[in-house]
Design a protein with these regions (language model features):
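Short phosphate-binding/catalytic loops that engage adenosine nucleotides
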Residues: 34, 93, 227, 291, ...
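Internal nucleotide-binding/catalytic subdomain
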Residues: 171-173, 231, 236, 253
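Acidic/polar loop patches that form or flank catalytic/metal-binding clefts of enzymes
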Residues: 215, 228-233
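Membrane-embedded hairpin module used as a gating/binding unit in multi-pass transport
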Residues: 218, 228, 246-248
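Acidic-aromatic/histidine active-site loop/patch
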Residues: 222
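A conserved regulatory-domain signal marking ACT and ACT-like small-molecule sensing domains
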Residues: 242-416
Length: 416
C-alpha cells in the first residue's frame, strides 16, 4: 500500500473555492496510485467563524481549565474534516473522516502545546484498507487516559509528520498560501527567491529562527525519522520546495537563508560563574516550560564571574525571568535584567565548518553599514545578530544581497 500524507492549512480549507483545489490535489495523488491521508486545519484565520482564535474569543478564558480550552480549540479542525468530506460527493473516491481517538496520536498533558510521546496506527490502517482517502483533524491528539489535547501553533504540520511516521508514508505534502521556502521573506527582501531543495538541518534552523512556512517541531520530527517534506502552494501546481537530505549537494550558495524577528528579549544574569552545569540547568528548566532559547553568550568580568545572557522570544520574557528568579539562589547570581524590544537577524548554513569566515563577513557587512550589534551568537549551522528593532529589515537585505551574490565556489576563496 502506497501512502502519502497531505496537509492543508486554514487558507486552503477556508472557502468552497479553495477546498475545490484540495480535492484536485487529492485526486491527483489517488490517480498516481496513493492512498491519501489528508490532514486539515481549522477554516480560515481570525474573524473567520471557526478559526481557532475566533473560538477562543467567544469565551472568558479565566473561567475554563486548560483541558476545557483544548476541547474548544480543537473544534475548528473537527468541523473542517466534516466540511471537506461533505463536498467530496461528486468525486469517485471512497472517503472517510477520522476522529481524535482514531488518529492514534498520543501526547503528554501539557495542554495547548502538548508533546507527542507515541503513535498507534491500528485504526488508520484498517480504514485505509476500505477507503481511498482519510480526512483527519490536525492540531490535536489525546493523552494515554484519552483526554483531548492540542499541539500548539502550527500543530497541524506536526500532526502530518506524526501520521507519516506512524503509517510509514512515502512523503508529506504541506500545502499553504505560499509557493515554498524562500531565501528570505520576499515582503522584506525584494530579490528573495524560492529554494527548490533544502536539507532538514537548514530548514529546522530557518523555522526556529522565524521562517513561517513550516513549524519547527514538524521539521524536527521529520529530520529524526527521515521523512521527506514537500512544501507547496494550494493554489498552483508548482514544484515548491522539497525538504530532504538527499539533495544537500545541490545547494549552490554559502548560506541557505536569512530570517528576521522583531520580538526578541535578552535576559542577563549578572555575576554568574562560568559553570556549564548551571548553564545546562537553566537550559533544561526553560525547555521543560516550552521556552525557546535562540542563543546564549557568556562575557567574563575582571573577577572570577561574568554575565550570562539568554536570547529568547519577547512574549516568553515574563515567564522566563520568573523561572530564573525562582532558581536565583541555586545559580548564585547577583541580579537579573530583562531587555525587550530587541530584533534578531539570522543566517543559516549547512557549511559553517567548511566556510568558517561566514560569521566574520556577516559582522563586517552589518558594522560597515552602521548597524549596531547588541550581542551575537553562533552554532554549527546558524549565526544570530541581535540588533535594534528598527535595523532588522535593513540587516536582512544587506546579508541576503551579500551572501546570495556569489556561489560556494566563488565564496570559499574570499576573506574579509
Amino acid at each position: 500500500m502506497k501512502i502519502i500524507v497531505q496537509k492543508f492549512g486554514g487558507t486552503s480549507t477556508a472557502t468552497s473555492h479553495s477546498r475545490r483545489l484540495i480535492y484536485d490535489h487529492i485526486q491527483k495523488a489517488c490517480n498516481n496510485g496513493y492512498k491519501v491521508v489528508a490532514v486539515v486545519s481549522a477554516m480560515g484565520r481570525f474573524d473567520d467563524p471557526y478559526a481557532t482564535d475566533t473560538l477562543l474569543s467567544l469565551v472568558n478564558k479565566t473561567n475554563l481549565s486548560n483541558e476545557e480550552l483544548d476541547r474548544l480549540m480543537s473544534i475548528g479542525e473537527t468541523i473542517s474534516t466534516l466540511v471537506v468530506k461533505s463536498e467530496f460527493a461528486d468525486i469517485n473516491l471512497n472517503v472517510a473522516t477520522v476522529s481524535n481517538e482514531e488518529l492514534g496520536i498520543i501526547t503528554d498533558d501539557f495542554f495547548s502545546s502538548a508533546n507527542i510521546i507515541d503513535t498507534t496506527n491500528t485504526y488508520l490502517l484498517e480504514k485505509l484498507e476500505k477507503y481511498d482517502v482519510l480526512i483527519c483533524p490536525g492540531f490535536q491528539g489525546h493523552t494515554k487516559d484519552h483526554i483531548l489535547t492540542t499541539l500548539g501553533r502550527g500543530g497541524s504540520d506536526l500532526s502530518a509528520i506524526a501520521l507519516a511516521v506512524s503509517l510509514n508514508a512515502e512523503s508529506v505534502e504541506i500545502y499553504s498560501d505560499v509557493n515554498g521556502v524562500y531565501t528570505a521573506d520576499p515582503r522584506i527582501v525584494s530579490n528573495a527567491f524560492k529554494l527548490p531543495y533544502i536539507t532538514h538541518k537548514a530548514m529546522l534552523k530557518l523555522s526556529l529562527e522565524g521562517a513561517k512556512v513550516l513549524n519547527h517541531r514538524c521539521v524536527e520530527m521529520a529530520a529524526k525519522h527521515n521523512v521527506t517534506i514537500h512544501a507547496r502552494s494550494s493554489f498552483s501546481n508548482g514544484w515548491g520546495t522539497q525538504v530532504s537530505d538527499d539533495y544537500e549537494h545541490l545547494c549552490q550558495y554559502p548560506i541557505s537563508g536569512v530570517t528576521g524577528a522583531f520580538n526578541n528579549a535578552l535576559i542577563r544574569l549578572h555575576n554568574m560563574d562560568n559553570d556549564e552545569r548551571k548553564k545546562a540547568y537553566i537550559y533544561d528548566t526553560l525547555k521543560e516550560n516550552n521556552i525557546i532559547i535562540h542563543g546564549t553568550h557568556y562575557q567574563p568580568n575582571l573577577n572570577a564571574s561574568g554575565n550570562y545572557t539568554l536570547m529568547i522570544n519577547e512574549e516568553d520574557a515574563p515567564k522566563a525571568s520568573q523561572i530564573i528568579q525562582d532558581i536565583k539562589e541555586i545559580l548564585e547570581v547577583d541580579r537579573i535584567v530583562v531587555r525587550g524590544s530587541v530584533g534578531r537577524v539570522s543566517i543559516v548554513s549547512d557549511d559553517f565548518e567548511k566556510y568558517p569566515h561566514i560569521y566574520e563577513e556577516a559582522v563586517y557587512t552589518l558594522v560597515a553599514a552602521g548597524i549596531n550589534i547588541i550581542i551575537s551568537s553562533k552554532d554549527e549551522s546558524c549565526a544570530r545578530f541581535f540588533v535594534d528593532k528598527k535595523d532588522v529589515r535593513e540587516a536582512q537585505c544587506l546579508l541576503h544581497d551579500y551572501f546570495f551574490s556569489k556561489t560556494k565556489e566563488a565564496f570559499q576563496y574570499e576573506k574579509v
